[in-house]
């Protein structure tokens, strides 16, 4: 799958750049107001009691700020953050080494926690519940279990697929929060903040235009800002104006709803080859040359969210709004 400008996932170039745009404390964090207010209370209460914060599970679509909140939690608690990911912890020993290196109060952040192997996940249970680590020494009838005490710590888990978490793991989190897509005005504020950090001027209307095409996702908003900044700087203009933003986004092939070429290809194929549907997932995948899982997990969610596509028992169906958006006549059914 090619890298998409409107993908919520981290693209290669962004690994080093994202931290520079990331807010460090709750008062700098824009959006997710309910989560933010609750975390403020939980953090203040933990500090008053001189205890570690309860384990936190953050879930929601990619690019909404789960990693940023983990950084903020550590900063607000005044402790170190140790970050890893589910796929990186292949064996129980990998997690054991990480847990035994923690200092009291540390925040351990595990991204994509739903991808932890079951054997590794089981090591987490006593670590989360009793701050201890059970190590098996030897094999067979002579095997014995050695229990090691761990310093108190806070686990922050992040996932895009909360339903894929096992019940025993999910139940051990004291704080569970779902991150929602952002409103346009919130994204515009995020864009203006990032523009100030990147030292590029941007008109309010231009920030709003970028926000409208960012699919409710801060990561996409910041990515669009950086690409439009390229156009502004190459042209020698002092900042990003609305006309420049619109022209740049059109050249980047991101339309006014945030759809790109692949979205248009999917919708057009359904309309032109299947009269708008219903069409089966496997058939659609074969026609547009993409894997069925990629269509279901990457492309469809946003199209359904904005009302251009529906899943029905008989298959996928394009809505009248999709015809209108693509400039096609809505068929009479």
UniProtKB/Swiss-Prot annotation:
Binding-site list for DNA: 311, 316
Record carries keyword Hydrolase: yes
Pfam families associated with the record: AAA_lid_4, RuvB_C, RuvB_N
GO molecular function, one term: ATP hydrolysis activity
List of residues binding ATP: 21-22, 63, 66-68, 129-131, 172, 182, 219
Subcellular location: Cytoplasm
Binding site for Mg(2+): 67
Primary localization: cytoplasm
One term under GO cellular component: Holliday junction resolvase complex
Domain of life of the native organism: Bacteria
NCBIfam families reported for this sequence: PRK00080.1, ruvB
UniProt note: domains: Has 3 domains, the large (RuvB-L) and small ATPase (RuvB-S) domains and the C-terminal head (RuvB-H) domain. The head domain binds DNA, while the ATPase domains jointly bind ATP, ADP or are empty depending on the state of the subunit in the translocation cycle. During a single DNA translocation step the structure of each domain remains the same, but their relative positions change.
Similarity comment: family membership: Belongs to the RuvB family.
Function: The RuvA-RuvB-RuvC complex processes Holliday junction (HJ) DNA during genetic recombination and DNA repair, while the RuvA-RuvB complex plays an important role in the rescue of blocked DNA replication forks via replication fork reversal (RFR). RuvA specifically binds to HJ cruciform DNA, conferring on it an open structure. The RuvB hexamer acts as an ATP-dependent pump, pulling dsDNA into and through the RuvAB complex. RuvB forms 2 homohexamers on either side of HJ DNA bound by 1 or 2 RuvA tetramers; 4 subunits per hexamer contact DNA at a time.
Name of the protein in question: Holliday junction branch migration complex subunit RuvB
Lineage: Bacteria, Bacillati, Bacillota, Bacilli, Bacillales
């Amino acid at each position: 799958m090619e890298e998409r400008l409107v993908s919520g996932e981290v693209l290669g170039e962004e690994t080093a750049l994202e931290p520079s745009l990331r807010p460090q404390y709750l008062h700098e964090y824009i959006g997710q107001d309910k989560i933010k207010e609750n975390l403020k209370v939980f953090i203040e209460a933990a500090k008053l009691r001189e205890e570690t914060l309860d384990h936190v599970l953050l879930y929601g679509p990619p690019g909404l700020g789960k990693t940023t909140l983990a950084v903020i939690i550590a900063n607000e608690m005044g402790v170190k953050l140790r970050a890893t990911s589910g796929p990186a912890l292949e064996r129980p020993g990998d997690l054991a080494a990480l847990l035994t290196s923690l200092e009291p109060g540390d925040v351990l952040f595990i991204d994509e926690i739903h991808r932890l192997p079951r054997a590794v996940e089981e090591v987490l249970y006593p670590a989360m519940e009793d701050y201890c680590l059970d190590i098996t020494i030897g094999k067979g009838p002579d095997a014995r279990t050695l229990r090691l005490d761990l310093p108190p710590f806070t686990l922050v888990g992040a996932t895009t697929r909360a339903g894929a978490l096992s019940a025993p793991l999910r139940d051990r989190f004291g704080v569970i929060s779902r991150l929602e897509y952002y409103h346009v005005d919130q994204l515009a504020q995020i864009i203006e903040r990032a523009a100030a950090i990147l030292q590029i001027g941007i008109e309010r209307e231009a920030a709003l235009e970028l926000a409208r095409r960012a699919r409710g996702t801060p990561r996409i908003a910041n990515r669009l800002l950086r690409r439009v900044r390229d156009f502004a700087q190459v042209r020698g203009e002092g900042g990003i104006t609305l006309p420049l933003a619109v022209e740049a986004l059109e050249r980047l092939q991101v339309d006014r709803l945030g759809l790109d070429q692949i979205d248009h290809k999917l919708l057009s194929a359904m309309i032109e080859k299947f009269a708008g549907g219903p069409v089966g997932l496997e058939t659609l995948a074969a026609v547009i040359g993409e894997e069925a899982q990629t269509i279901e997990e990457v492309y469809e969610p946003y199209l359904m969210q904005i009302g251009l596509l529906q899943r029905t028992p008989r298959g996928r169906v394009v809505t009248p709004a999709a015809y209108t958006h693509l400039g096609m006549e809505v068929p009479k059914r």
